Amino acid sequence: MLAYVFWHRPREGVASDAYEQAQLSFHRSLAHSRPTGLRRTALFEIDESPWALHVSDAVRAQAAPAYEDWYLLDDFTSLGILNEAAVGHGHRTAHDEAARRAGAGAGGLYALSEGSRSGSGELAAPLGDANVAIWVDRPLGASHTALGELLGDGMDPRNASLWRRQLVLGPAPEFCLLVRESSVFDEPAGVARTRLPDGWTATVTARRALWYG
């Protein structure tokens, strides 16, 4: 399973309510007529993207929230289909309404590394319930193979999933652990700061689900 993740925030002068409604309309459109290979989509409000969506001082002064989209896909072929379908017949109007209100944005592509799936291929831990994301990144030149296998230590696959970046499409971190927790103190041992090598970082972001379907 792959996940295309997109971080974005409103263009200067665009109200958050109007922006959210436009984004929700696009997600509803995809759910109504789902492209082949697209399993689920999710939209979250986040306080800030820790790898920085560069915005003007005016936008920052608005204290406008940032947003995080997840598009769960079967494979790379499904990613290509979504890319075409999003601006194709049936979705073009909703896509363009959302896009024209958007300001800064950045994307990343991740593959499921650890996490249970049902017989139908769905995640056992629903993406929409993951209200905490822990982003783990390494310094340039550092090896990650062995550590990547340990990040899931202590993770309950029924309530969490571990994702690993596939392509460098932007500033997104190397790994993402999604957990259904209300407190960062309950984070799995594998991503505890005391276990990470020097230079590695673990950034915790709280998320509020606006859409999952």
Where is each model-derived feature located?
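Macromolecular interaction modules
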Residues: 1-213
